[in-house]
């Protein structure tokens, strides 16, 4: 009898946890040409001259055409600002994350969360396929010039990315499961209070690339743990 009650209680707990997880899952919709994600309380701005946005299984799918890139070299002589993106403009401190599924299979194809001020002031947290033949994390912070950095390999074809703002500081994080986070880098940007953030996809040397963004989460909050961004 006691064992039966324990099993029943355990099943209830598991069911409740599953329902809670499902309730937290984000849902992207595309209706009458207007894109929305229910966990983002903002009007979404789409820049799709070089790609397309669609919805599949309640996730945002961002398709990049051949030759798309967001890039600045270290002396500012080479600048590219031509990726399909979906952006919104938050205010105050925030914590923003998403799961990225990207079957990255050509060098520099990738999907990113970005912080965008203008053509010369932006930052991206990128899950991309490197020339080494492995998928990993790269970042760039551009302030007229860029500073490409590689942050190691990530196994599989999915990763969680997170962008946090506290006052004028931004912090990038990655996670294999959306629970335990690793801090990648912190930085500042000119006009930090008025930047836009969102999703981007790129295929600078490939024939095109498609990435899926799901489990999108946003809240206006100030992190208490710098190393976790929570």
Per-region residue spans from a language model:
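Bacterial N-terminal signal peptides
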Residues: 10-19
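Extracellular glycan-recognition regions
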Residues: 26-230
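Boundary at the C-terminal end of the N-terminal hydrophobic targeting segment
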Residues: 20-25
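Bacterial N-terminal signal peptides that target proteins for export
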Residues: 1-10
């Amino acid at each position: 009898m006691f064992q039966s009650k324990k099993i029943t209680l355990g099943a209830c707990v598991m069911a409740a946890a599953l329902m809670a997880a499902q309730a937290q899952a984000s849902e992207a919709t595309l209706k009458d040409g207007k894109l929305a994600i229910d966990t983002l309380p903002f009007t979404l701005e789409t820049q799709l001259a070089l790609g397309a946005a669609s919805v599949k299984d309640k996730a945002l799918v961002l398709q990049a055409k051949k030759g798309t890139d967001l890039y600045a070299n270290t002396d500012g002589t080479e600048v590219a600002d031509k990726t399909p993106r979906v952006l919104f403009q938050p205010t105050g401190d925030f914590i923003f994350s998403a799961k990225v599924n990207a079957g990255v299979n050509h060098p520099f194809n990738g999907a990113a969360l970005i912080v965008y001020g203008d053509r010369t002031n932006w930052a991206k947290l990128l899950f991309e396929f490197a020339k080494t033949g492995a998928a990993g994390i790269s970042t760039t912070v551009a302030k007229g010039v860029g500073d490409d950095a590689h942050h190691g390999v990530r196994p599989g074809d999915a990763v969680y990315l997170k962008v946090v703002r506290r006052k004028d500081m931004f912090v990038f994080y990655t996670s294999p499961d959306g629970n335990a986070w690793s801090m990648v880098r912190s930085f500042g940007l000119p006009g930090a209070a008025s930047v836009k953030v969102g999703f981007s996809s790129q295929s600078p040397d490939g024939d095109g690339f498609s990435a899926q963004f799901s489990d999108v989460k946003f809240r206006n909050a100030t992190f208490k743990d710098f190393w976790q961004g929570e």
